Structure formats: structure tokens, C-alpha cells
Regions:
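Loop/turn elements at helix/coil->beta-strand transitions in domains of secreted/extracellular proteins
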Residues: 29-34, 57-62, 81-85, 154-157
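Append "and occasionally in soluble cytosolic enzymes with long acidic Gly/Pro-rich linkers
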Residues: 1-54, 58, 123-127, 146, ...
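Extracytoplasmic/peripheral linker and loop segments enriched in polar/acidic and small residues
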Residues: 58, 62-73, 99-166
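Ligand-binding clamshell of periplasmic/extracellular solute-binding protein-like
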Residues: 67-70, 85-99
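Short helices/loops that flank or line small-molecule/ion binding pockets
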Residues: 47-59, 71-83
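Extracytoplasmic/secreted cell-surface and envelope-processing proteins
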Residues: 44-47, 75-76, 94-98
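Active-site-proximal beta-strand/loop segments in catalytic clefts of secreted hydrolases
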Residues: 36-40, 66-68, 89-91, 161-164
Length: 166
């Protein structure tokens, strides 16, 4: 990875239909979940959304993929509370702080997972500020590793793929 403080100790999660079904039932949600997608988000986003829907169906979770027009996707669909869950793309950021601050802190307009209001997200917000100010490289690494663990355990990102930057 290009990120200096990448936490390589976090294992990649594998799809587990039984676990997905358990958590879906535990959530109290029932019925269809709508997923808005457009190839404006990234090339193949609609196909990726359909693949996710097919996998979710194995767990008894019905996802309705809504193909949105490319024109106006970022202003009319992405991060629009009325649309809810939607496909998006995050390009790499040069520093962990920039990525955390742009996408996950509770005070950013781009927090498209709406990760707010949990003990973990509150701790994350404090740690991001501490990490930004920390001059000791080893301490900063520990802080950012914990930030990544909090996102991994409590955040709302579903990341079906990673882009390879060469």
C-alpha cells in the first residue's frame, strides 16, 4: 500500500452468508434495501452493485439496484439522505489524516456513511486530531492504526474492491 501508516494487521473480510443473515435480522430491517448506482461513480459500478445484490440474496437479503443517470449523480444522488445507500468511489489520498478527515469525521460534509453517534466514531474523531498533531512517528502509527480498526469494526463502509494505483 502507498499509505505510510496502513494497518496491515486488519484481515480482509470474506463473505459469510450466515453472518450476513444474522446481522441483517439483528438490525430489525425487513424488506428490500435500495442501492443507487451509476457508472458515474466508477466504471462498472452498476455491475458491481448487481454482484453485491446477488451475494446478499444468498443471505436472504433483497437489494434492489437502482440504475441512476450519470448526469447529476454527484449532486442528486451521492450523499443525499433521500437516496440512502449509494455507490461511490474514493481515490487515494496522500495522507491518512486527509482520508480520515475527508470521509469519516463527523464534521465533514463528505461523511457518506453517516458514521456518527457511536462511541467508536466519537473516539475516532478525537484520535484523528491527536494523530494530526503527533510528531512522534511511532505514536502516530499507533493512533492511525487504531483509527483504522475503529472504521473496520464500527464504520459503515462496504468496500467491494480496491483500485491499484501504479
Amino acid at each position: 500500500t502507498a499509505n505510510r501508516y496502513h494497518n496491515a494487521d486488519l484481515p480482509q473480510r470474506e463473505f459469510d452468508a450466515d453472518k450476513a443473515a444474522y446481522h441483517y435480522k439483528k438490525s430489525g430491517h425487513s424488506g428490500k434495501i435500495q442501492l443507487s448506482a451509476s457508472d458515474a461513480a466508477f466504471a462498472g459500478a452498476v455491475d458491481a452493485a448487481q454482484l453485491m445484490a446477488n451475494s446478499a440474496a444468498e443471505a436472504g437479503i433483497e437489494i434492489e439496484v437502482i440504475r441512476e443517470p450519470r448526469d447529476g449523480y454527484w449532486s442528486n444522488v451521492w450523499n443525499n439522505d433521500a437516496k440512502g445507500w449509494c455507490a461511490c468511489y474514493w481515490g487515494g489520498r496522500p495522507t491518512e489524516d486527509w482520508m480520515f478527515s475527508a470521509a469519516y469525521t463527523n464534521d465533514t460534509d463528505w461523511n457518506d456513511t453517516a458514521w456518527k453517534g457511536t462511541d467508536a466514531s466519537a473516539k475516532f474523531n478525537v484520535l484523528v486530531k491527536e494523530g494530526r498533531a503527533e510528531l512522534d512517528d511511532n505514536k502516530r502509527r499507533e493512533i492511525y492504526a487504531e483509527c483504522q480498526r475503529l472504521i473496520y469494526d464500527d464504520g459503515g463502509t462496504i468496500c467491494p474492491l480496491f483500485n491499484n494505483y501504479v
